[in-house]
A protein has these predicted regions:
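Conserved SAM-binding strand-loop segment of SAM-dependent methyltransferases
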Residues: 60-67
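C-terminal capping/lid region of NAD(P)-dependent oxidoreductase domains
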Residues: 127, 154, 363-380
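Beta-strand-loop-alpha-helix segment that lines the small-molecule cofactor/substrate pocket
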Residues: 78-85, 89-136, 151
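Rossmann-like dinucleotide-binding domain that binds NAD(P)(H)
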Residues: 168-251, 255, 349
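N-terminal Rossmann-like dinucleotide-binding module
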Residues: 2-58
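C-terminal glycine/acidic-rich active-site capping loop/insertion
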Residues: 221, 229-232, 260-345, 380
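NAD(P)-dependent dehydrogenase/reductase Rossmann-like domain
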Residues: 2-15, 264, 347, 370, ...
Length: 380
């Protein structure tokens, strides 16, 4: 059985969810409100004006401006963190240590030590941690997973991902960010589809961004492209990432090459992916929706934006073509993993490994492609 794919109606307990950060995070409010096993208990936002506006719009009465006050609330079972990148790890660790289950938007962390502390806090608290990686719950990924599970792919031989996105117009902390520091959208499907974690990575940077952007993080590269080896497997993968100063339509792509069938993502938006069958047969495919894997009450959220649909849907949702219908799958996976007391997909070890690929890939690029080994925190 696929984890979280079937709703168990016998479960009667509801999980009290608190959402932290109400930009992208507000997308999940109605999903939790309608999930049969969740209670959308509280929201948290520093801006009181925004906090009250969102709270009134969705009828959420429990509101916090202080994250510290929120995690002290004994009624909060789990927090879903959607704050700026530099806060992800510290807030996740604090929430775990406060006895809360944690779902956190990507990336999980920005340093190897933060990764270690997330794993340690999850283990010591006994609470679940799940990085809310959209791509591994997108309809495209679920389609390739189905090809894998039914044996149509054959033996997986190679995986490749790319995330090409011009971040002009995003909040200032994105300016000059090392490309591989936000690489989970291309790394995660490559490792997820082989049920693996990376052992080591080598990366090269390419091109140069403006001096003003370089000054922010000390990263000169427009592009970074990395190869990684999957631990305890004979599979390797390649990922490419850029953030600024290149002409390219937005693309999050994932290719999977099998001995019998291979899947290649479409080159442009609104085109269809391609299947290569047996080497010579090529066919375009229409990707089905996978809402049937969800409780009926939240199925419609695979195909529509749920927050301020008319004007102000979050930019990541617009540019990412709705994140492949992943949002209700992510919420359902998190809720059911906690209530069933099972590992989520991704679990804490997968979450930090997939994030560390990008962290160490950038370090490798600064060292002209030096091979970087990823620590294995399963013994922490």
């Amino acid at each position: 059985m696929v984890p979280g794919s079937v709703f168990h109606s016998k479960m009667s307990r509801k999980l009290n969810i608190a959402i932290v950060g109400l930009g992208f995070g507000a997308e999940f409010i109605p999903i939790y409100q309608r999930h049969p096993q969740a209670n959308m208990y509280a929201i948290c936002q520093r801006s009181k004006e925004k906090l009250d506006a969102v709270g009134q719009a969705f009828g959420v009465e429990k509101r916090y401006q202080s994250f510290e006050d929120l995690i002290r609330d004994p009624k909060v079972d789990a927090v879903h963190i959607n704050s700026p990148i530099h806060l992800h790890a510290s807030q996740s660790i604090a929430a775990l240590r406060a006895g809360k289950h944690v779902a956190c938007t990507v990336p999980a962390c920005t340093t190897i030590e933060e990764a270690r502390e997330i794993v340690k806090a999850s283990k010591e608290s006994g609470k679940k941690y799940m990085m809310m990686e959209t791509v591994v719950w997108s309809r495209e990924y679920l389609y390739v997973r189905e090809l894998r599970d039914t044996g149509r792919l054959g033996r997986i031989q190679f995986v490749r991902g790319s995330h090409l996105q011009n971040m002009d117009g995003w909040p200032g902390y994105w300016e000059g960010l090392p490309p591989m520091h936000y690489a989970t959208h291309c790394v995660s499907p490559c490792l997820g589809i082989v049920n693996g974690e990376a052992e080591y990575v080598s990366c090269l940077g390419s091109g140069r961004i403006s001096e003003a952007r370089i000054a922010k993080y000390g990263s000169p590269f427009s592009f970074e492209t990395a190869h990684f080896k999957v631990r305890n497997q004979d599979v390797a993968g390649e990922v490419t990432r850029y953030l600024f100063e290149a002409a390219r339509q937005y693309q999050e792509s994932f290719d999977c090459y099998g001995s019998q069938t291979s899947f290649e993502w479409q080159l442009t938006e609104h085109d269809d992916p391609v299947l290569h069958v047996g080497g010579e047969k090529v066919e375009k495919v229409k990707i089905p929706d996978y809402a049937h894997l969800l409780p009926e009450a939240i199925r419609e959220f695979t195909t529509k934006c749920v927050y301020d649909l008319a004007e102000n849907a979050h930019l990541s949702f617009i540019q990412g073509s709705g994140h492949g219908g992943s949002h209700p799958h992510l919420a359902h996976e998190f809720v059911t993993a906690v209530l069933e007391n099972r590992p989520s997909f991704p679990d804490v070890h997968q979450s930090v490994n997939w994030t560390m690929v990008g962290i160490l890939a950038h370090e490798s690029a600064l060292r002209a492609g030096e091979k970087m080994h990823l620590p294995n925190f399963r013994g922490v």
